[in-house]
Amino acid sequence: MTAPLSVFVTGTDTEIGKTFVSAAMLHGFARHGLRAAALKPVAAGAYERDGVWRNEDADQLDAAANVALPPELRTPFLLKAPAAPHIVAAQEGVTLDLDTIVACHREALTRADVVVVEGVGGFRVPLNDTQDTADLAVALGLPVVLVVGVRLGCISHALLTADAIRQRGLTLAGWVANHVDPAMSFADENVATIRDWLAREHRAPLIGRIAHMTPAAPESAAAMLDIAALVESLRTARR
């Protein structure tokens, strides 16, 4: 029996489409014949429906996955206020514990062929006084896919984040260019620069380039991703 795959999805910043790209990846994995599940271990920003607290990002992931996980497994830490998680957690009396997340991930791997773990914010977002999302990626021991929001400043943000991923001893399995600013000048040149630098310095392939979409359509975006290349990269990283 083939061991399950898993990937940690991070971004160059907040609001650059991590959830959108994660959902597109889930659709792509499903089309590839894989049972795909999602974890959003820490979510900040909740709304109540029928007496149940929910999160919009987690809802999007649930809609894209073809393996449904119980909410308490998919998102063990659901914070109500939409702000920096360590600040909200302290206000709400919640301790964001990495061991709990690792245990949830371990259980998710028993239920799916591939588990997409979406981080929160950028690569180094504090979770408590001493640990951040980079520590979470290390604790999970996962290869990373970097979502680059293609807008002014994205080259530096992409290269700095890639370096931070490597400094933690993690593999950058690939990256996705997500065009968040449809009016950006020299978008093609920016993407080409990032592609060349990440290939040379990290051997990280461009998994896909997603055009600006209004409204966002993860199922359509899945066709813009090279899922076969991503699966191979994840398998190589696991060896």
Curated annotation (Swiss-Prot):
Its cofactor is Mg(2+). ATP binds at residues 15-20, 57, 118-121, 178-179. It is an enzyme of class 6 (ligase). Pathway: Cofactor biosynthesis; biotin biosynthesis; biotin from 7,8-diaminononanoate: step 1/2. One of its GO terms (cellular component) is cytosol. Pfam families: AAA_26 (PF13500). The keyword Translocase does not apply. It catalyses: (7R,8S)-7,8-diammoniononanoate + CO2 + ATP = (4R,5S)-dethiobiotin + ADP + phosphate + 3 H(+). Belongs to the dethiobiotin synthetase family. PANTHER family: DETHIOBIOTIN SYNTHETASE. This is ATP-dependent dethiobiotin synthetase BioD. It comes from Burkholderia cenocepacia (strain HI2424).
